[in-house]
UniProtKB/Swiss-Prot annotation:
Family recorded in the similarity comment: Belongs to the chlamydial porin (CP) (TC 1.B.2) family.
Source species of the chain: Chlamydia trachomatis serovar L2 (strain ATCC VR-902B / DSM 19102 / 434/Bu)
Bilayer disposition of the protein: Multi-pass membrane protein
UniProt keyword list: Cell outer membrane, Cell shape, Disulfide bond, Ion transport, Membrane, Porin, Signal, Transmembrane, Transmembrane beta strand, Transport
InterPro entries per UniProt: Major_OMP_Chlamydia
Signal peptide: 1-22
Subunit-structure text: Part of a disulfide cross-linked outer membrane complex (COMC) composed of the major outer membrane porin (MOMP), the small cysteine-rich protein (OmcA) and the large cysteine-rich periplasmic protein (OmcB).
Protein name from the UniProt record: Major outer membrane porin
Amino acid sequence: MKKLLKSVLVFAALSSASSLQALPVGNPAEPSLMIDGILWEGFGGDPCDPCTTWCDAISMRMGYYGDFVFDRVLQTDVNKEFQMGAKPTTATGNAAAPSTCTARENPAYGRHMQDAEMFTNAAYMALNIWDRFDVFCTLGATSGYLKGNSASFNLVGLFGDNENHATVSDSKLVPNMSLDQSVVELYTDTTFAWSAGARAALWECGCATLGASFQYAQSKPKVEELNVLCNAAEFTINKPKGYVGQEFPLDLKAGTDGVTGTKDASIDYHEWQASLALSYRLNMFTPYIGVKWSRASFDADTIRIAQPKSATTVFDVTTLNPTIAGAGDVKASAEGQLGDTMQIVSLQLNKMKSRKSCGIAVGTTIVDADKYAVTVETRLIDERAAHVNAQFRF
C-alpha cells in the first residue's frame, strides 16, 4: 500500500511540472515540513506539557508567492432578459429608429468566456502553531486579461438612423441591434491584491499527511485597455470610463471628450476556496495531490462604455465605423446615406462567475535543511494554473 501511494503521488507531481495549467491548494504537510529555523531552533515538545509556553509553540515563515492563471473557466452572471430597442423586422426606412426599450432575450445569458488570465506576485507570511497549523496571508500585485464573444458584453448599436436627420440629436433613440459576431478583450492594470487563509495537518501516518485549507482573495484592478474587434464597430479605448446604473438611452455626449457622470472601469474580484489534500514525504521531496472547491466572481458594476466619437459632425460623420451597405458617396442632400453605419455603439462589462466549482491540484515541495522549502503546483479542471512558493522559517 505504501509503495502504491508513493507511486501515485510521485507520478502526479512529475506530471504537473510538465504542463502549465487563483488560489493554490498548497502542500497539506507544509505546517510540519520546516521544523527548524534560520534564527531560532525548532521546538518539538508536547502541547500537553504544562511546562510548554506559547513562545515554544509559535514560529514565523516568509517568502515569495507567485500564482499564474492561464485560463480560468468563467461564465456571465446576468438576467435572461435585456432592455433595448425592438429588433428591426421590416423595411421601415432609416428614419424609423426606435425610441422605447423593450424586453429582449439577453444574448449574454450563460455565455462562456473564451479566455481569462490572472497573474499574481506577492509576499507570503505564515504564522505556524505547534508545527501543525498555519495562518497565512499574501500581499502583492495582480494583473489580468479577459476575452470573450461580444454578446458576452452586450455590444449593441443603432442601425438604420439617418446621420444628417434631425432625430440624430434626439436623446430618446435607443440601440436596436446586438452584435454577436465579434470579439471583445480587455487588459487590467497591475494593482494591489491580498489573500488570507488557514491550513492544518489533520492526520499523519508515517510519512503520509492529510490536510485541509481555506482561503479568501480579493483585488480590484482597473481596466487599462479595452479592444472591440467588430466589422460594424471597431474601436480601442485606453483607461475606459463609463456609466454605472445608467439605462438606455445614454447621454448623447457619451463617448466624447469632456463627458461627465462617468467613472473609471474597474473589476472587483473575490474568490474563496476550500481544499483537501494528501502528501507523502520522500526524503527532501514531498509530492501531493488534492481536490478543491472554489467560487470566484468578477463584478464591474455592469458599467456601460460608449464607443469614442466626435462631439460634432465632421464630414457628415461622428464615428469612423466602416459602412455595412457599401454606400460611400455621402452627400448632405442625400438623407439616409449614412444609415448604413452603426451609431451610438456601447457595451457593458457584465458580472462573471466560476463555471466550474471543483478542481484538482498536483505538486511537490522540496525541503532543504528543514529551514527552506520550494513548492511547485499546477491546477486543472476549473482552471489551468501554475503556482510557485519559496519560503524560509525564522
